[in-house]
Amino acid sequence: MSQSVSERTRIKSDRYESGVIPYAKMGYWDAAYSVKDTDILALFRITPQPGVDPVEAAAAVAGESSTATWTVVWTDLLTACERYRAKAYRVDPVPNATDVYFAFIAYECDLFEEASLSNLTASIIGNVFGFKAISALRLEDMRIPHSYLKTFQGPATGIIVERERLNKYGTPLLGATVKPKLGLSGKNYGRVVYEGLKGGLDFLKDDENINSQPFMRWRERFLNCLEGINRASAATGEVKGSYLNITAATMEEVYKRAEYAKAIGSVVVMIDLVMGYTAIQSIAYWARENDMLLHLHRAGNSTYARQKNHGINFRVICKWMRMSGVDHIHAGTVVGKLEGDPLMIKGFYDILRLTELEVNLPFGIFFEMDWASLRRCMPVASGGIHCGQMHQLIHYLGDDVVLQFGGGTIGHPDGIQAGATANRVALEAMVFSRNEGADYFNNQVGPQILRDAAKTCGPLQTALDLWKDISFNYTSTDTADFAETATANR
């Protein structure tokens, strides 16, 4: 008896039987998989729904973030499906957690368009985060292979070139955010910039939500800021700047503001993370072509980065932003008012500043990674810091960082210039003592260094007296899984 055409051509494999079969049996789980150098690796923190096997949950994440849908489709056979399927290859229980797992997943590099964060993220953090079989999902870390990294430009300027332009080495840079962030006129805004820079800061900056509101349009702000910068540079003989926020409703307007900032003499522009990945990459290309520093405010990141069980760990955002080409990114303070476990913050800073990453589980770094000659990105510490914490800031954050004292400059009782001077004197005293071998992080030694410096600097003494009891000792919501962290300010 002759067979029908459909019977003769049917694939004799359970994998391609019509209907719904488990993701693990569809090829998205392979415990024996040998990771390739060209694979993009992702580590997810998975909380399966009750009754869902963690291996099946990991396979589901692999499938739904690559080639799978909810049922078998015969068009898989028209592709190199075995190659293109993401492979979950390892599942480990999370230490000190119940029914939560780390899932390691490998993706074929050809699944992603070159130099496109939007395409990369459309798969890795796309529909899969709403998958019903998983009650919570967090992207903890990624390894981007050398071959894919080389398609991205990375920071246009980087740490070394920025220091060359400022002629400033061996010390953190000093900045401040103009306060109040909203409501000032252009003239008063420019005055804040001038006073802060003349008092000793390297930079002033716009805050995340100052764009072009009725009380001060962007062009007015830019012109008054540049007047303050030029006057302060002439008075001090130092290179100065102010981060001009060019974030706008459309890319056409962003480019318009960027071109104007360049035309009037600014050397740096600023954008917000909420602009989106395509917009960030686009203006980063412009910054490289126009020899401008690009500062990124991480506005909005805590909506998905702060909670430990769901979202995206900020270390992944750091990797993506370094790839995209920003020169600065806010990355935490440890001791300030914003979320910041010391070990986690050190991990973020390592990702931004090192050329090669080693596995460091206490810091939350799960993969080795070579940055493929992409330049280093300058971390920015901002949010609730003051000069009395200088020994802690230098200890935790090192030299390659911009320390931004907004309220800690502009809130000084004797005025903005006095606040800037207090920060400059505190920084220089602490760096000098450190270089002389002092145990500056010691709870007695560090504060004494500041008190000694304040004997010849009235503004510093005033600042220390005002903020001596201010600290933000709250337990972080995002802490290391493989080490315990002491309270940051102890």
UniProtKB/Swiss-Prot annotation:
GO terms (BP aspect): reductive pentose-phosphate cycle
EC nos: 4.1.1.39
InterPro entries in the cross-refs: RuBisCO (IPR033966), RuBisCo_large_chain_AS (IPR020878), RuBisCO_lsu_C (IPR000685), RuBisCO_lsu_C_sf (IPR036376), RuBisCO_lsu_fd_N (IPR017443), RuBisCO_lsu_N_sf (IPR036422), RuBisCO_lsuI (IPR020888)
Subcellular compartments: Plastid, Chloroplast
Entry binding sites for substrate: N127, T177, K181, R298, H330, S382
Record carries keyword Signal: no
Recorded catalytic activity of this chain's protein: 2 (2R)-3-phosphoglycerate + 2 H(+) = D-ribulose 1,5-bisphosphate + CO2 + H2O; D-ribulose 1,5-bisphosphate + O2 = 2-phosphoglycolate + (2R)-3-phosphoglycerate + 2 H(+)
Any Pfam family: RuBisCO_large_N
Cofactor(s) in the UniProt record: Mg(2+)
Binding site for Mg(2+): K205, D207, E208
Cofactor: record remark: Binds 1 Mg(2+) ion per subunit.
GO MF term (any one): ribulose-bisphosphate carboxylase activity
One of the record's GO cellular component terms: chloroplast
Keywords assigned by UniProt, alphabetized: Calvin cycle, Carbon dioxide fixation, Chloroplast, Lyase, Magnesium, Metal-binding, Monooxygenase, Oxidoreductase, Photorespiration, Photosynthesis, Plastid
HAMAP family, per the entry: RuBisCO_L_type1
Family designation: Belongs to the RuBisCO large chain family. Type I subfamily.
Comment field (misc): The basic functional RuBisCO is composed of a large chain homodimer in a 'head-to-tail' conformation. In form I RuBisCO this homodimer is arranged in a barrel-like tetramer with the small subunits forming a tetrameric 'cap' on each end of the 'barrel'.
Protein name according to UniProt: Ribulose bisphosphate carboxylase large chain
